[in-house]
Every structure is written in structure tokens, then in C-alpha cells.
A protein has these predicted regions:
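Compositionally biased terminal segments of proteins
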Residues: 1-193
Length: 193
């Protein structure tokens, strides 16, 4: 008979601590927490009606391609496609996405206190950064989501299975930048700066 979990958040916290211990402290606990919260945000995007409107890019994509050995990323980056650029509209979209329940992951998001600000205002298509708070058991974690617009993906977005820290959780499949676009964007950033 399977043991009934009463507090998924506490159980996940213990599992993440075990991963830290089992790695010989190679993975710092706070980095694993940040990755876990990013992962569970991505899960909600992947099962939402907006999953085809947000294409994963940036550090979270590099993590998906390379696994645990990449540097930790504190935000999640998306290219938005076929969706309004209006900040208030996007805020409503993310309230809807972040309210998708997933009891087994132990995470909830404070959808009442999402804030946003414009980013990359010097570009032809300015983006938006959302600041959100994730909660798990007694842990409160602040994170951000950067949304960009107008980039070209060559040849086209690819389907990516996002690696899971805790295998018991529902899996994540997202649209993501192609590796060619990742490399081109990195070169463009180096030249632009």
C-alpha cells in the first residue's frame, strides 16, 4: 500500500535536501530550490491553453539541454508569439497559468501580487518582466519571468522535454528555441554590448 503524503511541500523539500546531500554538496540547496520553482512554473505553462504562445529561451533552456551541470538561472525567459503585447493582458494570462493546480509538486504561486515592468525598451518590440512569488511549505521564493517579442527563430521552435528534479511530478514538454537560434542570439548579444 502506498504511503499517503500529507504535506507535499515538506516532502519535496526533504527530497531536494537529499539530492543536495547525495551530490556531495555539488548542488547547493538554494540553487536546487530556484530550479525547482522554475520547473514547476514551466509545468504550468506546458499544460495551459497558452503553451504554444510561449517559447522557452535563455538559461532555463540551456539547463534543459545540458541538465544539472549548467549555472543556475534566477529567471525564466520566453519569446511570446501570437499573443498580445499588452502588459495588463499578459499579467492576466500569467495569473491564469500560475493558478493551475498541481498538488503533487507542493508549489503555489501568489497570483494576487504579480507585478510587472517594461524591459528592453530600446528595442523595436519592448518586453515585459513579471515578478512573482512562489510558495512551498514554509518557503517563500521570489522569481521573475522575462517575456520578449519579435525575435526570429531559425529554422523553427523545437519541442523540448524539460528535465525533472523530482521524477514523481508530472512531466514537462515545451516549445523552445532551436540550438541555432540560441547560438545566433548569444553572438548577437556579444556584438550588441
Amino acid at each position: 500500500m502506498e504511503k499517503q503524503v500529507k504535506n507535499y511541500g515538506r516532502s519535496i523539500r526533504e527530497k531536494l535536501l537529499n539530492i543536495t546531500r547525495d551530490s556531495g554538496q555539488r548542488y547547493q540547496y538554494m540553487y536546487l530550490l530556484a530550479r525547482y520553482f522554475n520547473e514547476r512554473l514551466l509545468y504550468r505553462v506546458s499544460v495551459s491553453q497558452y503553451k504554444d504562445n510561449f517559447v522557452l529561451k535563455g538559461g532555463s533552456l540551456l539547463y534543459a539541454l545540458d541538465g544539472l551541470d549548467t549555472r543556475p538561472t534566477v529567471d525564466v525567459d520566453f519569446l511570446a508569439e501570437k499573443i498580445s503585447r499588452d502588459r495588463e493582458y499578459l499579467e492576466g494570462v500569467f495569473r491564469e497559468i500560475l493558478s493551475i493546480p498541481c498538488e503533487k509538486d507542493g508549489v503555489t504561486f501568489d497570483i494576487a501580487h504579480i507585478t510587472s515592468e517594461p524591459i528592453t525598451v530600446e528595442k523595436k518590440y519592448p518586453g515585459t518582466r513579471f515578478h512573482i512569488t512562489a510558495l512551498m511549505d514554509t518557503i517563500v521564493h521570489n522569481m521573475s519571468i522575462d517575456i520578449g517579442f519579435g525575435d526570429v527563430i531559425t529554422p523553427c521552435p523545437e519541442s523540448v522535454d524539460f528535465p525533472m528534479l523530482i521524477q514523481d511530478n508530472p512531466s514537462i514538454n515545451l516549445q523552445a528555441y532551436s540550438i541555432e537560434t540560441v547560438i545566433a542570439e548569444k553572438f548577437h548579444t556579444m556584438i550588441d554590448r
